[in-house]
Design a protein with these regions (language model features):
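N-terminal secretory signal peptides that target proteins for export/translocation
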Residues: 1-7
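Bacterial N-terminal signal peptides
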Residues: 8-21
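Electrostatic cytochrome c docking/interface patches
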Residues: 20-37, 47-49, 147
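Extracytoplasmic electron-transfer domains, predominantly the class I c-type cytochrome c fold
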Residues: 35, 52-123, 136
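Short cysteine clusters
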Residues: 40-43
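Short, exposed beta-strand-loop hairpins at the edges of beta-sheets
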Residues: 125-143
């Protein structure tokens, strides 16, 4: 009886952990992200043959230094962030999308470059939904095969 009780207690303690970690494994949905990216297509392109538009093309975004897509005229704020070491990864994209200007300004201040933390990025769109951000990142990862 004592053994069953200990096993039962262990199972009860483990259940929330399993539920949380299995949810994280499925938290990103690239198919849903493709639908979310349609909002981004007002300015951005992705996929074979994508070219810069109002915003830079998004191929190979994961792992790229900010402000470095050839042929795109970035804002000084965006270029300064890249020069200060901003690399696009899941975490930085997730933090950037709800408020691009605030993210870049804070990034530069944290890097000790408050004199460069002025102006604005060209990206006026804000993606505030956490799930949509996770999903669009999963979609972007499909076009960053080396990452």
């Amino acid at each position: 009886m004592h053994r069953i009780t200990a096993t039962s207690i262990f199972a009860l303690l483990l259940t929330p952990f399993v539920a949380l970690t299995s949810g994280q494994a499925f938290a990103q949905d690239a198919a849903a992200g493709e639908q979310v990216f349609k909002k981004c297509m007002t300015c951005h392109r992705i996929g074979p043959g994508a070219k810069n538009a109002v915003g830079p093309e998004q191929n190979d975004l994961i792992g790229r230094q900010a402000g470095t897509v050839p042929g795109f005229a970035y804002s000084p704020l965006n270029k300064a962030s890249g020069e200060a070491g901003l690399i696009w990864n899941e975490d930085t994209i997730f933090a950037y999308l709800p408020d691009p200007n605030a993210f870049l300004i804070n990034f530069l201040k944290e890097k000790g470059k408050p004199d460069l933390a002025k102006g604005s990025t060209k990206m006026a769109f804000k993606l505030t939904s956490e799930q949509e951000r996770k999903d669009v990142i999963a979609y972007l990862k499909k076009f960053s095969p080396s990452k």
